[in-house]
Regions:
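Short C-terminal tail/terminal secondary-structure segment
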Residues: 2-8, 100, 104, 211, ...
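Conserved glycine-rich cofactor-binding loop
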Residues: 20-21
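The beta1-alpha1 cofactor-binding region of Rossmann-like NAD(H)/NADP(H)-dependent oxidoreductases
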Residues: 46, 67-79, 112, 226
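Conserved mid-core segment of classical short-chain dehydrogenase/reductases
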Residues: 77, 100-116, 158-164, 203-207
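Catalytic Tyr-X3-Lys loop
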Residues: 91, 109-128, 142, 146, ...
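Catalytic loop of short-chain dehydrogenase/reductase
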Residues: 99-100, 146-171, 176-184, 196-197
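Amphipathic alpha-helical dimer-interface segment in Rossmann-like NAD(P)H-dependent oxidoreductases
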Residues: 121-139, 153, 180-185, 237
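Short, small/polar-rich loop/turn modules that mediate ligand/substrate recognition or access, typified
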Residues: 184-188, 243-245
Length: 256
């Protein structure tokens, strides 16, 4: 498959956490289409992860799968070591893995349990993995880290889910800005803040939520995982070489 010269990532070695489905999968595919070799991380969806890796291999890219439960602190070093051993280097690390409080098994947990899960996986995972991979990238003399936030975090959203996600995603967005200062100039760090993106929850959302998305979004439609992936491709490329420490909304111009 030919690769466009714009945002060309040929030869880049990448790991995307939580990339067996949804936004993570879309990012992995987009970066592979840009020429990158991509490691697919998953927690328990082995078959889905292997299907993504196979899809990337059909594009002519190298791709393997790595499993790690990011709720367990002891798995972090192992995941990082496996990634560097597989590629010999890592040019791009995307922290996409997160707890699904809306459609997954965690949806049945109480408020405190949900908060604990988010802090363990979304926040601690992003912070500690970013710092560890960032240190190695500094030693390489180059690298790019991309995190995933949420556009409503800094504006606020009603309800338990709004409170919980705002807590975790605001932490990630603030951390991204500070980590950039620590790792520059060798390593760039940015964060994408998605708006209403049509993933598993959105596909089954009620008519009330469907109308709310249209009402709050000037584009009057859901965004797609591919919309996030295209921004990820740009931010990971040399075309974004002077962009770091930024939290960029991809939300159809949503206002609330």
């Amino acid at each position: 498959m030919s690769v466009s010269s714009f945002c060309n990532l040929t030869g880049k070695k990448v790991l995307v956490t939580g990339s067996s489905s949804g936004i993570g999968k879309a990012i992995a595919i987009e970066l592979a289409q840009a020429g990158a070799d991509v490691l697919i991380h998953y927690r328990k969806s082995k078959e889905a992860a292997e299907m993504v890796a196979s899809q990337l291999q059909k594009l002519g890219r190298k791709s393997e799968t790595l499993s790690a439960d990011l709720a367990c602190l002891e798995n972090y070093e192992s995941l990082l070591n496996q990634a560097f051993q597989t590629w010999g280097q890592l040019d791009i690390w995307v922290n996409n893995a997160g707890v699904d409080l809306l459609t997954g098994s965690e949806a049945k947990l109480d408020y405190g349990q949900k908060l604990e899960k988010l802090l363990d996986v979304d926040v601690r995972g992003t912070v500690l993995l970013s710092r560890a991979v960032g240190e190695r990238m500094q030693q390489q003399g180059r690298g790019c880290i991309l995190n995933i936030g949420w556009d409503q975090s800094d504006r606020g959203m009603e309800g338990a889910s709004g409170e919980l996600f705002s807590t975790s995603k605001n932490a990630i967005m603030g951390f991204s800005r500070s980590l950039e200062v620590s790792l520059a100039p060798q390593v760039r760090v940015n964060c994408i803040a998605p708006g209403w993106i049509l993933t598993a929850w959105g596909e089954n959302a009620s008519d009330v939520w469907q109308e709310r998305v249209k009402r709050e979004t000037p584009m009057q439609c859901w965004g797609t995982p591919e919309d996030i992936a295209k921004m990820a491709r740009f931010l990971c490329s040399d075309e974004a070489a002077y962009i770091t420490g930024q939290v960029i909304n991809v939300n159809g111009g949503a206002v609330r």
